[in-house]
Amino acid sequence: MDDFKYDYSPMEYLINEKVTGRKCERNREILKLRFLRGLTFEEIAEIMQMSDKQIGRIIHRYGDPLLIMLAKSR
């Protein structure tokens, strides 16, 4: 077994590497709150001061492809 320790979880690595664009920092933070901390859309919307509809749109745009990449990497 390899004793190598990752600095990031696999999902956090994907979020940091694959989420790019004009508002990437905000989108990365939203995805980390959802996938790494397990918060609901409503909780994230309150923290980020956005509507839960906007949060859902971002999570579905980026999150679904990230989950697929994570599943393929295992």
What are these regions (language model features)?
Residues 21-37:
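Short amphipathic alpha helix immediately N-terminal
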Residues 37-43:
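A short, glycine-centered helix-capping/turn motif at helix boundaries
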Residues 63-74:
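Short, Lys/Arg-enriched C-terminal cap helix and immediately downstream tail that follows
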Residues 31, 44-45, 55:
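Hydrophobic positions on the alpha-helical face of helix-turn-helix-like DNA-binding modules
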Residues 10, 54:
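Residues in the helix-turn-helix
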Residues 11-23:
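Short amphipathic alpha-helical boundary/capping segments
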